[in-house]
Curated annotation (Swiss-Prot):
One Gene Ontology MF term: DNA binding
Descriptive protein name: DNA-binding protein HU
GO biological-process terms attached to the record: chromosome condensation
CDD domains: HU
Keywords, in A-Z order: DNA condensation, DNA-binding
Gene: hup
PROSITE patterns: HISTONE_LIKE (PS00045)
Oligomer status and interactors: Homodimer.
Keyword set includes DNA-binding: yes
Protein purpose: Histone-like DNA-binding protein which is capable of wrapping DNA to stabilize it, and thus to prevent its denaturation under extreme environmental conditions.
Lineage: Bacteria, Pseudomonadati, Pseudomonadota, Alphaproteobacteria, Rickettsiales
Entry similarity comment: Belongs to the bacterial histone-like protein family.
Pfam families, A to Z: Bac_DNA_binding
Amino acid sequence: MNKTEFIAFMTEHGHNNKHAAHKTLTKADAEKALNLVIESVISAIKSKHNVNLTGFGSFEIHHRKEREGRNPKTGAKMKIDAYNQPTFRAGRKLKEACN
């Protein structure tokens, strides 16, 4: 499901959720809300803060050290620079919903 399909899902399937406060949510409002959440998570991660959404999961930064790698085509050694890797770890409610 891509972002557009998810926004449509949020507006069309809100009535199936007994706790749905978004029963009258328009697609424009749903898109604004989703964009705000995404931008907020990105901003927090850029600021080196972990984001924990209880039940859903957590977004974290893991620092990867500089290391030596190989070019798979030529086999030549090359340096892979250090970088920060964003990661997501699913929460209990999300894991339970999948099983």
